Regions:
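Transmembrane helix-loop junctions in multipass membrane proteins, especially transporters and channels
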Residues: 11-15, 52, 181
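A structural signal for well-ordered alpha-helices, especially hydrophobic packing surfaces
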Residues: 2, 14, 38, 42-45, ...
């Protein structure tokens, strides 16, 4: 009986009101830190999505991963604390958060894997940089040809003018393709590009096939410029198809945002529950825990 009394007395000492208040405060602080780290991870992820360079994207992505790692570390520590003593409601709320956080991590992993690629930004840079220059060189060569051969046969002029017009259409189709998220819509755009490409090639090949134009420097320049443009267009379409910037932005604004709110709501509910848990009072005199009446001496 004495052993039982000592054990109960020891337990009460271990879980005194002051100590339970300290545990409650520590758990509340842990949940608060989880909420802050979760918000920091979300902000860093958004910065990674919106960054325009690979290096900046990687820097922000690393910050997001570090913040989510902190959330996970705190979640495990809180789980260990709950295993020692916690109400079933607290454990259930932590389990709810854990499920939501697992989904958050899955989305985060897929999203951050996209952010460092910046394929849409690179496609735009090619389209408005080297590709635009190659198209301009081709157009200028055809303009010189038309001015120089203004009195030539109508068929010859139509070949040059047709190639020039098709090139302009083809060039203007690139930016909408880069900004498009739908694969079927991109298929339609590429079909129109292929049609324009065939017309440009038909015009240039038709000019080069004429015996008196085989040595024409402007025709040669136009064909060389269009060859460079075609190579760049292939690269642009490949980058555009990956759509890493648009896909990561869509995920950030939809799936990630919803997962973030789910986790924050779960943590808020858990924080409220921890604060609401009652603290049992310890006996004022542990001697009263002994069994039987005091018999005196």
């Amino acid at each position: 009986m004495l052993v039982l009394v000592l054990l109960v007395f020891h337990y009460q000492r271990e879980r005194s009101p002051a100590q339970q208040i300290e545990i409650k405060a520590r758990r509340t602080d842990m949940v608060g830190r989880m909420r802050y780290a979760l918000a920091a991870a979300s902000e860093a992820e958004k910065s990674a999505v919106l960054a325009v360079t690979d290096q900046d994207s990687q820097t922000f992505a690393d910050q997001a991963r570090a913040a989510t790692a902190e959330v996970e570390s705190l979640r495990q520590a809180l789980g260990e604390s709950f295993a020692a003593s916690a109400s079933q409601k607290e454990k259930d709320l932590l389990a709810t958060f854990s499920r939501g956080f697992a989904n958050f991590l899955r989305i985060d992993r897929d999203l951050l894997a996209l952010t460092g690629k910046n394929t849409n930004i690179k496609a735009f840079a090619l389209a408005f940089g080297p590709a635009a220059q190659a198209a301009q060189e081709t157009d200028s060569a055809l303009s010189r040809f038309l001015a120089k051969h203004a009195t030539s046969a109508q068929k010859t002029l139509l070949l040059a003018a047709g190639a020039q017009a098709a090139l302009l259409r083809l060039e203007t189709r690139l930016p909408p393709h880069i900004a498009e998220l739908s694969d079927p819509r991109m298929d339609e755009m590429e079909a129109l590009m292929d049609k324009d490409d065939r017309q440009v090639r038909a015009g240039l090949d038709g000019l080069a096939a004429q015996p008196d134009l085989r040595a024409d420097s402007d025709v040669a320049s136009a064909r060389a410029g269009y060859a460079r443009f075609s190579e760049l267009r292939t690269q642009i379409l490949a980058l555009s198809r990956q759509n890493t910037n648009l896909r990561s932005l869509a995920m950030s604004l939809d799936q990630k945002r919803k997962a973030m709110f789910t986790c924050q709501d779960a943590l808020h509910a858990l924080q409220q529950q921890i604060a609401a848990e009652p603290i049992p009072e310890a006996p004022s005199n542990p001697r009263r825990l002994s069994a039987g009446p005091h018999t005196g001496y």
